[in-house]
Swiss-Prot record:
NCBIfam families: ubiA_proteo. One of its GO terms (molecular function) is 4-hydroxybenzoate polyprenyltransferase activity. It comes from the Eukaryota. Keywords: Isoprene biosynthesis, Membrane, Mitochondrion, Mitochondrion inner membrane, Transferase, Transit peptide, Transmembrane, Transmembrane helix, Ubiquinone biosynthesis. This is 4-hydroxybenzoate polyprenyltransferase, mitochondrial. Pathway: Cofactor biosynthesis; ubiquinone biosynthesis. Coiled coil: none annotated.
Amino acid sequence: MFIWQRKSILLGRSILGSGRVTVAGIIGSSRKRYTSSSSSSSSPSSKESAPVFTSKELEVARKERLDGLGPFVSRLPKKWIPYAELMRLEKPVGTWLLYLPCSWSILMGAMMQGATLSATAGMLGIFGVGALVMRGAGCTINDFLDRKLDQRVIRSVERPIASGRVSPRRALVFLGAQTLVGMGVLSLLPAQCWWLGLASLPIVFTYPLFKRFTYYPQAALSACFNWGALLGFPAMGVMSWPTMIPLYLSSYLWCMTYDTIYAHQDKKFDIKAGIKSTALAWGPRTKSIMKAMSASQIALLAVAGLNSGLLWGPGFIGGLGVFAYRLFSMIKKVDLDNPKNCWKYFNANINTGLYFTYALAVDYILRLFGFL
């Protein structure tokens, strides 16, 4: 026992004396997050391949996390904050990007059905709550499955599970609570939505694993992240597959585009950590591929409008033009080798999607009052 303690002290001195520490070292020494048996079972090769961050880099990551909590999350009780971070409440961009295709399908379905303003507004509100909860559940799943990988990427090293502020067990309990709330929201929708919503759950719970064995994890994320483009129609009493499928595929390609930009933020660390993404698969061809996807996205959105009889509304056709302009402008301007610039243009997709929501809302109001 004495020998073991002495070795631990010497190891601690060597860590403190060095200006560079591994994330695993920081995590193990500060919160005893791993047992001695798990440490001894890890292979030397895995330790050697783990990226090494300076203590300054880790402190900068911690400061950026605290500075990024925002006025709402930072005012929560201290014990609640890590769980709010698990849901990414301080980064609402994901909730918006999940919600926007829902709003398109709801508004298009409302126009096709001639739904009242109160029914449409109510459904937009229900889907808003659902987007917040299920995006949070998706982030919790992602952080639970990626807790080891997150320790090897500086941007994610401060996430609640990776940093040890939330244990894996507590994260699973929290995930269960979020899933129950999400199922409660789903129960408020018509029965036609239930089987369609439940069909998305397998990929929701497994998509974080895709980055381990394929360079196209964005394909899996896009498949589940835009499910609301399908759900909004039956929620409004419409089941029009010729409209639903092209809208879903259009949203799918949009997600592929913006999440590829997101992936370019971490590509240097991803190479070292063995994490795969379209950013690494496409490399210098990324912008050309994104242009092709965006052109296809706009075409599919036009097909959805044509099949629904909504294409020639002033809002739809105008919104389509704004959508196309902003997409191609983003692709031209984004610096894929600059993480901060990638984050800026990734966030810009909120407004891009919102403008189309506003455009559909204009057509809906015009139809509601008999002008279309």
